[in-house]
């Protein structure tokens, strides 16, 4: 029975037969983060292949080195990917396809939180939205063929989008996703006054670091729902998950800067 005290290792142990021999792609892997924790939970149970990514390739390489030291037979590949850059995502997808003909589980974990000043990528996309959602949207689309079930490989691929309780702060701002001008927002696209109060942030429709982060987490929830409805491809199931609280570098950054 799982409850609020359940750890990742508990779930992995209970479903180890579903891990053995499977290929997992996990984005945003570094020591102290959720990505590394996922790897550590999976590694004891014989995954067929762990493919891990990071913007700074040294970080997932360090995790891979530690895992191999503990599990010498573990097959693990490390790929550089910057989710803010579509070309980097495309290159990473090609590298993944070279080392794995089938992807059973894609964990869209990488993310940023509470960038103090409104920042746009080279494509003009607000940074939280670009990295937390758009980059993962593209990666998922590019790997769809590798994840969909076939007659020879009937197991449905699974997409796991890491969300957050912060999604309650903001719906998706269809009228102004990049915080250019809030005059185009409809009332039901505005931040939640109640949630802003609960999180201890001022209510405003202009750029707010936590509101921008929250919008991106709403987006990944909607993304998972759309995938499960068959929009992307038949034979793929998607989930959005709230991982709960964890002390990690992102949280420490928020405490120091937001």
Swiss-Prot record:
Q: Which gene is the coding source of this polypeptide chain?
A: fscI
What's this protein's family per the entry? Answer: Belongs to the short-chain dehydrogenases/reductases (SDR) family.
Write down the EC number.
Answer: 1.1.1.-
What is this protein's record name? Answer: Oxidoreductase fscI
Q: Which domain of life is it from?
A: Eukaryota
Q: Which UniProt keywords apply?
A: NADP, Oxidoreductase
Matching entries from SUPFAM superfamilies are given as: NAD(P)-binding Rossmann-fold domains
Hey, which pathway is this one from? Secondary metabolite biosynthesis
**InterPro entries reported for this sequence:** NAD(P)-bd_dom_sf (IPR036291), SDR_fam (IPR002347)
Function per UniProt? Oxidoreductase; part of the fragmented gene cluster that mediates the biosynthesis of fusarochromene, a tryptophan-derived metabolite closely related to a group of mycotoxins including fusarochromanone. Within the pathway, fscI catalyzes the formation of the chromene ring from the prenyl moity added by the prenyltransferase fscG. The first step of the pathway is the epimerization of L-tryptophan to D-tryptophan in the presence of the NRPS-like tryptophan epimerase fscC. D-tryptophan is subsequently hydroxylated by the tryptophan 6-hydroxylase fscE to yield 6-hydroxytryptophan.
Question: Does the record's keyword annotation contain NAD?
Answer: no
Organism, scientific name: Fusarium equiseti
Which residues hold NADP(+)? 34, 59, 82, 109, 141, 193
Catalytic EC class: oxidoreductase
In this protein, the active site sits at 163
Recorded GO molecular functions are: oxidoreductase activity
